[in-house]
Amino acid sequence: TFYASIDHVHADAMFMVALFVEIYQNYSALGEGGAPIKLPDPGRYLDYCTRQREYTSALTLESPVVVEWLDFLRRNGGTLPTFPLPLGGSDIPCTGDLITVKLMDSHDSDRFEAVCAQSGVRFLGGVFACAAIAERELAGVDTYQVITPTTTRSSPAEFMTTGWFTGIVPISVPVEGMSFNQVARAAQAAFDSGMHLANVPIERVLELAASLPGISKPGPGVPMLSYLDIGLPPLNPVVMGQWQDRNGTLYTDLGAANQIGMWVNRRDTGTTVTVAYPDNAVARESVAQYVDMMKVVFLRAAEGRADSVSSPRIPRATV
């Protein structure tokens, strides 16, 4: 049995997955009497940090990328968005918890991908669309607002380098009165057009905007939605497909989960969502409602029943 214990501050999810692939490939090669796998040369994390520091130090409030981030913040009351359902009082400390739910089996995942392709978007665009429609139906939002992480690795060497090569992309998607296809196209466009903002840490934007009225640091309840298909490069679909067969397991220490982290993952057995949330009764109920609605919307889209967005069922909640 191989164990690896890594502080998430020092290694992003892409590296952790690559680590498992490396262990598996080398173990298989040695077990079959072969030589260790020759790995590509890694880069230096210090070089990446130096490059990023030089770039962000040159930014000003007039820099186009900073202006784009500020526009997103202002659409959310001057800060990052908040989860649309109640999460309980933030004044009472609590630990975090996780829930994982299967959204679609492999057959429905394939059908969902086909629907996305017919709409001119990738699976990722459909994921954001389903979350947007779920929020519309649960909380009456007119525009879906969320942040999503993405890798900032830009070379083969960086994909072999230990470190934190991750930024966030702001997503704003109009949803009122629109069909799944329309929402998906808007979501895909929002992601694609905002990818360059991942290289601009939100902390740097807030630092520059410290003197601006109406701009503030985010509080608890910021939603983050991530999508990962383990069958797509640079991951190894053959190796990752055997993850569960090899009893591969990730153990996490959530600590105080003040935010809402959502990870939609697609593999050969289907599509799941894992949600990290504050471990209290209010947040637990809200997350359960949210995930249940997400599943309904995903299946509805996969079955070709993605008509106009339905009217909201309940008013938007205050976190």
Describe the role of every protein-language-model region.
Residues 41-97:
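Short amphipathic alpha-helices and their capping loops
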Residues 1-46, 286-300:
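Active-site-proximal acidic secondary-structure segment that organizes catalysis
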Residues 32-42, 144-145, 306-311:
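Short, glycine/acidic-rich hinge or "gate" loops at secondary-structure transitions
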Residues 16-17, 95-111, 253-267, 306-319:
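AMP-binding/adenylate-forming domain of the ANL superfamily
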Residues 38, 57, 135-203, 213, ...:
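Acyl-thioester-dependent acyl-group transfer interface
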Residues 9, 22-33, 71-79, 172, ...:
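Phosphate/oxyanion-binding loops and surfaces in catalytic or ligand/nucleic-acid-binding neighborhoods
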Residues 1-5, 61, 88-155, 166-167, ...:
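Gly/Ser/Thr-rich phosphate-binding loops and adjoining beta-strand/alpha-helix segments
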